[in-house]
């Protein structure tokens, strides 16, 4: 297995398709997608823009859909849910189709949707993702961070490094310098992941919006909180991996 890390979807090569791609947005889209599916949501359908989301949601029964939206770390006005994983309780989301659009993570998923196998990873479902990759024995895997509006995000690269560390990758399996750096970053911070999230620019951004968002950072920093792997089952639609 050869593994490559790309800090943002904009860095993904325009040519070449790997066997598997892993989308990462620790703060908070891929954490929240895992939380939604673990809580019993029927599926999460992702959109880069709000207009497409609203148009698609109208074809779904009103009693079986929830609109989830975030821009700049804040819930979209008029939507049912934001991007806090703590909102996605079984009482709220069980058997619901979640129509979701976020600032960064949903854009990453749309960039990767042509790849044969697409899953999402976060720190909270690290172990489940690593086991999925081991079972799949994919020849080439891309670990793609979402970043923040096209820029590097510390927490996404740390999560990519966590995947590489847990897989026990040899140096020969690390396909680019970004993968080497991701592994080194995670190994430096592995005993203080909450501290890393608090120090990250997006963590600081969320805390500036509300100190209560520190509870989200704590949620997102906890390894192996969830044992689910969200997998793309059709373009833009994620459900539990079989």
From Swiss-Prot:
Keyword Magnesium (UniProt): yes
InterPro entries (UniProt xref): ComB-like, ComB-like_sf
Cystines in this chain: none
EC number: 3.1.3.71
Top enzyme category: hydrolase
Pfam families: 2-ph_phosp
Requisite cofactors: Mg(2+)
UniProt keyword terms in alphabetical order: Hydrolase, Magnesium
GO molecular function, one term: magnesium ion binding
Reactions catalysed, as given in the entry: (2R)-O-phospho-3-sulfolactate + H2O = (2R)-3-sulfolactate + phosphate
NCBIfam families the record matches: PRK00886.1-5
Family of this protein: Belongs to the ComB family.
HAMAP family: ComB
Protein name, as recorded: Probable 2-phosphosulfolactate phosphatase
Gene: comB
